[in-house]
């Protein structure tokens, strides 16, 4: 299997499957997917981060609320997950529904989820 084929197949994974893949690779090879931090750079980073406006947001489902079925439908539409995976995500709240999306898209997704009855926050 070529690297290009492997990358294409990984690209077809759902968010849940990709997360499971990362965990499996971390366990198998004893590594972490978290980036390494250099001490000198870490001290300067908070000042730089404060000056820059956040451009990517994570949409986090904090609670399903009263209309759980409607929330599951919206989660399925947003993520492309199957019914069981979407239900598990809603039942397991707080869960990240979408990662690293633009501010406009994050606000749109947040509105859709809130309209369905969910409690949502942006990180």
Curated annotation (Swiss-Prot):
Keywords linked to the UniProt accession: Ribonucleoprotein, Ribosomal protein
Segments crossing the lipid bilayer: none
CDD domains in UniProt: Ribosomal_L7_L12
Coiled coil regions in record: none
GO terms for biological process, alphabetical: translation
Pfam families for this protein: Ribosomal_L12, Ribosomal_L12_N
Entry GO CC: cytosolic large ribosomal subunit
Molecular function as annotated in GO: mRNA binding; structural constituent of ribosome
InterPro entries: Ribosomal_bL12, Ribosomal_bL12_C, Ribosomal_bL12_C/ClpS-like, Ribosomal_bL12_oligo, Ribosomal_bL12_oligo_N_sf
Sequence similarity: Belongs to the bacterial ribosomal protein bL12 family.
Protein role: Forms part of the ribosomal stalk which helps the ribosome interact with GTP-bound translation factors. Is thus essential for accurate translation.
UniProt name for this protein: Large ribosomal subunit protein bL12
Species of origin: Chlorobium luteolum (strain DSM 273 / BCRC 81028 / 2530) (Pelodictyon luteolum)
Chain's gene name: rplL
């Amino acid at each position: 299997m070529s690297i290009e084929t492997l990358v294409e197949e990984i690209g077809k994974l759902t968010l849940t499957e990709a997360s499971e893949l990362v965990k499996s690779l971390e366990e198998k090879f004893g590594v972490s997917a978290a980036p390494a931090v250099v001490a000198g750079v870490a001290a300067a980073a908070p000042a730089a981060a404060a000056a820059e406006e956040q451009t990517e947001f994570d949409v986090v489902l904090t609670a399903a609320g009263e209309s759980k079925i409607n929330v599951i439908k919206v989660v399925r539409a947003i993520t492309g997950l199957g019914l069981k995976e979407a239900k598990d995500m809603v039942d397991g709240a707080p869960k990240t529904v979408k990662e690293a999306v633009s501010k406009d898209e994050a606000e749109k997704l947040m509105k859709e989820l809130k309209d369905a009855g969910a409690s949502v926050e942006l990180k």
